[in-house]
């Protein structure tokens, strides 16, 4: 079931093809000042392509980066959408920079019955159900009295043709009232086990000096997610080092997951997005001479690593004990363990 869907298609001669189905409005994208990709591109294409990068699949943790800057380059100098899937939640992070100041809006096409409840959009189709929860730059206005929430996202219901052209269906647009030229959008898509599930992840919005993030409580685990505000290209000639809750890093984004009641330093599951180091006090948890994308897990005495980002990768990872085995991108590698650090070298993407 496509619980969040694209609008579909229709036969070419129908005006709805070129006026709607071929356009950005028919997809789950961000519009700027009401516009998406240039409509001229349906006739001439785009010389600048979009790309998918750095796919990591570590079972309950997955990541991929979608770079749509090229096709949007008439309006955007930066149009990145990160997908980070941890357990039952997909975090969608939009990193957007435009040439001019204006209004951003997020489009959502439900593949089922949609209902706004407070700050959430609930979508249900049979036994499938998700919650779409915008968290940054603002929450969704809690009630229909949007004038009581002048800074929060307000929603618009838009009617559009169905794929069979026999009627219309509704999609949603979430508008940011502020006029800006740079924004971080973070939306949580919560995958419900059943439509009636009540015990959903509890999410705290958190921020500090030069970072924003979340703390997620769910099923006895805590996940801390951090987004580095200095690592988005705004400082071309300066480092992007931040300190967040005792973690010191230059990573664009990172997450640590640990059991409730434990200290974050005891985490056995880390995600690092475009970073060269992660330290806490005098202890190095990850280090490399080049910025990498990494998922690290310690399970049953084994260290598992998923790595991408460079043609050849060398890095060190903290481990309190010498692991029984080290598996990198699905392959068993020799265990090189020195002074609490597992060293891997010569990793290439095949």
Model-derived features with residue positions:
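Zn2+-dependent peptidoglycan hydrolase active-site motif and core
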Residues: 9
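Structural recognition of the beta-strand scaffold that forms the well-ordered cores
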Residues: 2-6, 29-31
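CBM-like, beta-strand-rich accessory domains located in the C-terminal region of large
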Residues: 12-350
């Amino acid at each position: 079931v496509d619980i969040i869907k694209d609008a579909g298609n229709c036969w070419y001669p129908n005006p709805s093809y070129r006026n709607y189905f071929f356009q950005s409005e028919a997809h789950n994208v961000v519009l700027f000042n009401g516009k998406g990709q240039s409509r001229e591109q349906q006739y001439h294409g785009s010389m600048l392509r979009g790309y998918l990068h750095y796919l990591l699949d570590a079972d309950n943790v997955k990541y991929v980066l979608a770079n749509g800057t090229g096709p949007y380059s008439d309006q955007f100098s930066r149009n990145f959408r990160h997908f980070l899937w941890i357990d039952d939640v997909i975090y969608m992070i939009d990193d957007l920079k435009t040439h001019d100041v204006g209004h951003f809006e997020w489009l959502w096409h439900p593949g089922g019955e949609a209902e706004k409840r407070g700050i959430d959009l609930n979508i249900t189709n049979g036994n499938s159900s998700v919650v779409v929860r915008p968290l940054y730059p603002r929450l969704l206005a809690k009630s229909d009295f949007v004038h009581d929430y002048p800074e929060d996202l307000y929603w618009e219901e838009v009617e559009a043709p169905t794929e069979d052209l026999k009627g219309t269906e509704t999609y949603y647009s979430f508008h940011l009232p502020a006029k800006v030229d740079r924004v971080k959008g973070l939306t949580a898509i919560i995958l419900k086990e059943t439509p009636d599930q009540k015990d959903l992840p509890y999410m705290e919005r958190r921020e500090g000096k030069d970072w924003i993030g979340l703390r997620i409580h769910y099923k006895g685990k805590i996940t801390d997610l951090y987004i580095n505000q200095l690592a988005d290209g705004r400082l071309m000639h300066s480092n992007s080092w931040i300190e967040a809750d005792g973690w010191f890093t230059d990573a664009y984004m990172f997450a640590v997951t640990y059991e409730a009641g434990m200290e974050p330093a005891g985490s056995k599951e880390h995600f690092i997005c475009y970073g060269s180091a992660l330290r806490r006090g005098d202890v190095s948890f990850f280090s490399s001479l080049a910025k990498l994308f990494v998922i690290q897990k310690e399970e049953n005495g084994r260290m598992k690593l998923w790595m991408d980002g460079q043609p050849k990768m060398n890095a060190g990872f903290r481990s309190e004990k010498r692991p029984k085995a080290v598996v990198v991108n699905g392959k068993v590698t020799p265990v090189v363990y020195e002074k609490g650090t597992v060293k891997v070298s010569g990793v290439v993407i095949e």
